[in-house]
Amino acid sequence: MDIVLQVSGLSASYLKNRVLDDVNFNIHAGTMTGIVGPNGAGKSTLLKVLLELHPRLSGTVEFFGTTYRKAKSRVGYVPQRGSVDWDFPTNSLDVVMMGLYGQIGWLKWPRRRHKELAMAALDKMGMADYAERQISQLSGGQQQRVFLARALVQDADLY
């Protein structure tokens, strides 16, 4: 079975405290893996380091045998609520469309099929009726479903 994520000797700190120390693991294609632990154990920091949203002190991270930057389009991610600016003036459909920018291209207009893909993802999450609703006007659970739709529309190889 192919390795989709390989982490070796990963260490990172947060607020001058080392929270990850020599972390090693592999995730294989076709498997489901969970990251569990008590509050403050470093779960969120681990994900941020893997996605290059937080610097690592040492170690290597490979997605599909390459760097995250090169494999980014193959990875779907749902951010934690605290890392989203809920007052940013955008609607649910636009948030989901953001998941397609890797396919659309930088500074290009989305085509009709992109909107159809985004609407289908919203529909899968039971949120199609809220496509034009501002993200800030949704409940917390509805907001999370919109971000799940954004991850799903990417058609990623790793979520």
Regions found by a protein language model. Give the residues of each.
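Conserved structural motif at the start of ABC-family nucleotide-binding domains
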Residues: 5, 19-22, 131
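The feature captures the beta-strand-to-loop junction immediately N-terminal to the Walker
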Residues: 36-38
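Helix-to-loop junction immediately C-terminal to a conserved catalytic motif
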Residues: 51
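Conserved ABC ATPase signature
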Residues: 134-138, 142
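Conserved ABC ATPase "signature" region
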Residues: 112-130
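Hydrophobic anchor residue at the start of the ABC signature
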Residues: 148
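Conserved ABC transporter NBD signature motif
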Residues: 56-71
